[in-house]
Swiss-Prot record:
Subunit structure: Interacts with TssA1.
Pfam families, per the entry: T6SS_TssF (PF05947)
Transmembrane segments: none
Source taxon at top rank: Bacteria
InterPro entries on file: T6SS_TssF
Cited function: Core component of the H1 type VI (H1-T6SS) secretion system that plays a role in the release of toxins targeting both eukaryotic and prokaryotic species.
Name of protein: Type VI secretion system component TssF1
Source organism: Pseudomonas aeruginosa (strain ATCC 15692 / DSM 22644 / CIP 104116 / JCM 14847 / LMG 12228 / 1C / PRS 101 / PAO1)
Length: 619
């Protein structure tokens, strides 16, 4: 039972008793019949009558309050449906290849969406299921050595002299396995995950993507050197095809980037070396080196970088997977139906979103479309059959209230209603309802025995993988915030646009309010980062647009983000700046651009990203 019912009941009863005194004074004759003479009522039957009335009005008040989230949910269902769903647990894993199994010389591809099963805990019955976000190609190679140095001339000699701006460098030695020379590999791109403790991987990420001025591939004995353009070194994880959360076409994808960042910042710590094939054809041995020179030197990285911090064959993964829920038996006496993934283990699964709803009876299958989806009679026919979804925080059982839940994350429950075009109950002769949904394992990722076994996960598909190791996470799942007072704050961002960001004195406040919607309010470190955004300013500018074809100039916005670096101890400010750079580029329309500048009070201008054309359509 909702605990607010008792609160409303006491309020209504107090109001009746207080107003009874005024009523008795104004109308003593009528009040005398009801035995009302003041705050107390002498007649016990009238007292019971007043208490019953207070109970009924309290229930009416609850029903009125229930219409408030219904309105906000309906609005968010149209514009940003991902706000209504919980944020699943996320992780970063390495798929370590088995050199003794399969032919890896031509590469073995593991596509995006591969299923990973976690190990069972001592009291668990259900294994957590994760799905990968990046495609991974396995090769017979390893990172044998890596070192960061601050004097390129002393380490690299003439190679460093070819780049006078170089003040530091990173050397990565790759070694092939099973006696296979590099020129027999068709490898062209090599993604690496930056692994490590505390702030170190974030500092290395800033050096690689913010300060790289030259990239070389060479033989260890310097017998040959191949220079690559700096554009061959790029970030991974920001594109829609690398997304962890579902990509909703009608929603702005910049919000998804923020949601993933605040759930697990390490999911963006990926860099990729591309265009390697030409250099590899020159390497007839089993070792080669990737050398990156930097225009700035970070002294804290010198002597601390090793091969364990540059990990190949990695991918982010999310505890989100498709599953058919148990059939629902329909009844005319019930308007809403509880969606249960598995009745034998109801607490081990949570519905993230519904993908397909269909009714089953004596006749043909009846498909139901989302009520707020685009309606196309030519495609779905003229049968007005829709479903509407409602999500509520899970109510603890009496046993859980006595002994406590198994974790602090309780999760939510999903209810579906069958309606017609007017949201009236759908009249039917169906007997069962079949539902396909995206599901999570609720709070089970919190109990996974990470590091207790040789492999933290098992790859469901057959592949030459001997170990799946968890490198970051699993992160804590988060409940939807559309049920509390932040629902209106979610709706308020509908009015946020690049003009509000450009408004002097208002841009920082608008972005901080936006970040509070995604950051965990119970995490002091994240809240400190949000407050670390001190100022946002913008000015119009004209730049040459970076696009193929003839030279084209365009008008856009130079947006400067000013941060307090002391608020980002442990993670650094560069990664959040990179997320914002992609966010702002997606925010502006085509035929315009943004040029994002990252500044801190401690270091001044940290990074000026290249002008990036907008990707938002005008219509």
């Amino acid at each position: 039972m909702n605990p607010r019912l008792l609160e409303y009941y006491n309020q209504e009863l107090q109001h009746i008793r207080e107003s009874a005194a005024e009523f008795a004074e104004e109308f003593p004759k009528i009040a005398g019949r009801l035995s009302l003479s003041g705050f107390e009522c002498a007649d016990p039957y009238v007292e019971r009558l007043l208490e019953g009335f207070a109970y009924l009005t309290a229930r009416v008040q609850l029903k009125l309050d229930a219409e408030y989230p219904t309105f906000t949910h309906n609005l968010l269902e149209i514009a940003y449906p991902h706000y209504l769903a919980p944020t699943p647990s996320m992780t970063v894993v390495q798929l370590r290849p088995d050199p003794n199994e399969g032919a890896l010389s031509s590469g073995f591809s593991i596509e995006r969406g591969a299923s990973l099963r976690g190990q069972l805990g001592p009291d668990d019955q259900t294994a957590c299921e994760y799905r990968t976000a990046h495609p991974v190609t396995l090769w017979p190679l390893e990172v044998a050595q890596a070192d960061y140095f601050g004097n390129p001339a002393a380490v690299l000699g003439r190679l460093a002299a070819s780049e006078p701006r170089a003040k530091a460098g990173l050397r990565i030695r790759l070694r092939s396995g099973a006696g296979i020379p590099f020129d027999s590999l068709s490898l062209d791109a090599l993604p690496l995950y930056l692994h490590g403790a505390d702030e170190q991987p974030y500092r290395l990420y800033e050096q690689l993507l913010g300060n790289a001025c030259a990239v070389f591939v060479r033989a260890p004995d310097n017998a040959w050197v191949e220079r690559l353009p700096t554009s061959s070194l790029r970030a991974r994880g920001f594109d829609d095809e690398d997304a962890l959360l579902p990509v909703v076409p009608r929603a702005f994808q910049g919000y998804r980037l923020l949601q993933e960042y605040f759930a697990l910042p390490a999911r963006f710590l990926f860099v990729e070396f591309s265009g390697l094939n030409r250099a590899l054809r020159r390497c007839h041995g089993e070792e080669l080196e990737l050398v990156v020179l930097f225009g700035k030197h970070d002294q804290r990285l010198e002597g601390t970088v090793d091969a364990e911090q540059l990990v190949p064959f990695c991918t982010p993964a999310i505890n989100l997977f498709p599953r058919r829920c148990d059939r629902i038996h329909l009844s005319d006496r019930v308007n809403e139906h509880h969606v249960i993934v598995d009745r034998t283990r109801p607490l081990d699964f949570e519905v993230h979103s519904l993908q397909q709803v269909s009714g089953h009876g004596s006749g043909p299958e009846q498909p139901f479309q989302p009520f707020y989806a685009v309606r196309d009679p030519a495609r779905y026919g003229r049968e007005q059959a829709y479903f509407r979804v409602r999500r509520e925080p899970r109510v603890l059982s009496s046993k859980q209230r006595r002994k406590g839940p198994r974790s602090t994350y309780v999760g939510s429950e999903t209810f579906v209603a069958l309606v017609d075009a007017n949201q009236a109950p759908y009249r039917h002769d169906l007997r069962q309802l079949g539902i396909a949904a995206l599901c999570t394992n609720r709070d089970l990722p919190l109990f996974m025995p990470i590091g207790a076994h040789k492999s933290d996960f098992t790859l469901e598909d057959s592949a030459p993988v001997m170990q799946v190791r968890c490198l970051a996470g699993p992160s804590r799942p988060r409940a939807s915030r559309a049920h509390d007072a932040s629902a209106w704050r979610l709706i308020s961002q509908l009015s946020l646009n690049y003009l509000s960001l450009a408004e002097r004195g208002q841009g920082a406040a608008a972005l901080r309010e936006l970040l509070r919607l995604y950051g965990d309010s119970g995490d002091p470190a994240l809240q400190l980062q949000i407050e670390g955004l001190r100022e946002v300013s913008s000015k119009p500018c004209t730049r040459r647009l970076p696009m193929p074809g003839p030279i084209v100039f365009g008008r856009g916005l130079e947006i400067t983000l000013d941060f307090d670096e002391n608020a980002f101890r442990g993670t650094g400010v560069f990664l959040l700046g990179a997320v914002f750079e992609r966010f702002l580029a997606r925010y502006v329309s085509i035929n315009s651009f943004t040029e994002t500048v990252l500044r801190t009070g401690e270091r001044g201008e940290v990074m000026r990203w290249q002008a990036k054309p907008g990707s938002r359509p005008n219509l």
